[in-house]
Amino acid sequence: MKNRILLINLGGPRDTSEIEKFLIDLFEDPLVFDLPLPEWIRKPLGKWVAKKRAPKVAQTYKSMGFGGGSPLVSETSKQANAIAKALEKITGEKWEGNITMTCGYPDIRKLNRDFLVPTKQNILLPLYPHFSRSTVLSTAKLVEQTTKFCPVSYEGWVAPFHSSQVYLESIRDLILDFFQNRLNRKDFLHSDSFQGVSNWETIDLIFSAHGIPIRLIEKGDRYREEINSNVENLKRLLYEKGFQGKCHTSFQSRVGPSKWTEPNTITMLEQLGKNGVKRVAVYPISFVSDHLETLEEIGEQLKKIAYNNGIAEYHRIPAPGIYPKFIEAMAKIGLESIQSSKNECICKKLGGHFPNLKSGECPINF
């Protein structure tokens, strides 16, 4: 059997024709569109919401300049190839990099079972640094539908990696290389504006994470806790390297009227402007590749809000993408997953428990 690593991400439409399929997959998922409704109501409602949002979302995708779609799939493919090469360099063996998406294409539901069974020769890497029911648990459940067993406690399944030292150091170095204009622009999208940051040591740094509904936190989801821990660890590493600016944590991409994790990044920028802050950099802490939420939301929409609130200097720090130190970190984290048996239900441990589960029952099978 050949060595393989499968990168799993949420997904994004590659062109306009895939937008509706992407949104339907997203809103039909009971762990994403998590409403206290009977399934016979929730699922059709999710499909209706997806169809209604599709035309508006299409305009936003069009504005990014990638043919009416998202670059996420192509960026994930680049990451898979780069990580496979890094694995070959570390192990001296041949590795094949593959990708699949939980929403849209390439569709994880259509993938051959052999690719979805985690083993020492078949690593499954969900590209989520932090646990959430709406991402990691959703992914594991989709894998289980094909494999007929929960994958998360098996060798070859990569758990959320926000606390990994090699990951943390790679993100610290990415931020510092951005500040000091040392990034290879060819490795990043929309990089024409990358010119370094004067007096970077004292700029205000916002770690902006994708928000989730508070109802998930109330069910025990530890996503917010892991985001906060991630920020604290990065702050420590940055301060050790001479950074002295204030660090802030906020949440973006809220959808719908329900209460989401706070503070919202919009509110954060408004408050910083009100407090007289003039220089801000924003890092997308919950994302590992650039797409709609980083290029358009952080890069354009939030920038306008910052300027409108008196902030004179605004920088979008890119997601890691194929940044070499990040790629090496992911390869090492992947190998760590096959070197020790976890034999524990991380979904339940990290907030995937459901009230109706019996003791010892896996939440994947709820």
From Swiss-Prot:
Keyword Hydrolase found: no
SUPFAM superfamilies found in the cross-reference section: Chelatase
Chain coiled-coil ranges: none
Ligand binding (Fe cation): 210, 293
Record's GO cellular component terms: cytoplasm
Keywords for the protein's UniProt record, in alphabetical order: Cytoplasm, Heme biosynthesis, Iron, Lyase, Metal-binding, Porphyrin biosynthesis
InterPro entries according to UniProt: Ferrochelatase, Ferrochelatase_AS, Ferrochelatase_C, Ferrochelatase_N
Main location: cytoplasm
Biological or metabolic pathway of the protein: Porphyrin-containing compound metabolism; protoheme biosynthesis; protoheme from protoporphyrin-IX: step 1/1
Catalytic activity: heme b + 2 H(+) = protoporphyrin IX + Fe(2+)
GO MF terms held by the record: ferrochelatase activity; metal ion binding
GO biological process: heme biosynthetic process
Gene3D superfamilies on file: 3.40.50.1400
Subcellular location: Cytoplasm
Domain of life (superkingdom): Bacteria
Catalytic activity, EC: 4.98.1.1
Known role: Catalyzes the ferrous insertion into protoporphyrin IX.
Family: Belongs to the ferrochelatase family.
Protein's name in the database: Ferrochelatase
Protein's organism: Leptospira borgpetersenii serovar Hardjo-bovis (strain JB197)
Lineage of producing organism: Bacteria, Pseudomonadati, Spirochaetota, Spirochaetia, Leptospirales
Gene name in the database record: hemH
